[in-house]
């Protein structure tokens, strides 16, 4: 079985992960963890959309098992796969 490694963007300062916040009815927000399939996609996303914060962010690799436990621990609604970091094009998965 092949192991698909995923890449996340994390803050060096407080350890929080980069998420997409989606508003729900009633004013609440849900968070989706941004997941990249390649490390260079994550770096492109940072450079394109948050270049001024690049020195405060790092790329972290995670296995599918780590991703599952991380999502449970932080209470994310799902994850969002970034398929094109420049536009960005994102697929939300609950």
Show where each model-derived region lies.
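Conserved NAD+-utilizing ADP-ribose enzyme module
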Residues: 1-94
């Amino acid at each position: 079985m092949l192991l698909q490694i995923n890449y996340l963007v994390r803050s060096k300062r407080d350890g929080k992960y980069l998420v997409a916040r989606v508003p729900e009815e009633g004013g609440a927000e849900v968070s989706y963890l941004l997941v990249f399939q390649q490390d260079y996609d994550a770096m492109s996303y940072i450079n394109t959309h948050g270049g001024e914060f690049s020195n405060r962010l790092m790329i972290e690799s995670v296995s599918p098992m780590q991703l599952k436990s991380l999502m449970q621990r932080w209470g994310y609604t799902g994850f969002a796969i970034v398929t094109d970091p420049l536009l960005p094009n994102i697929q939300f998965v609950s």
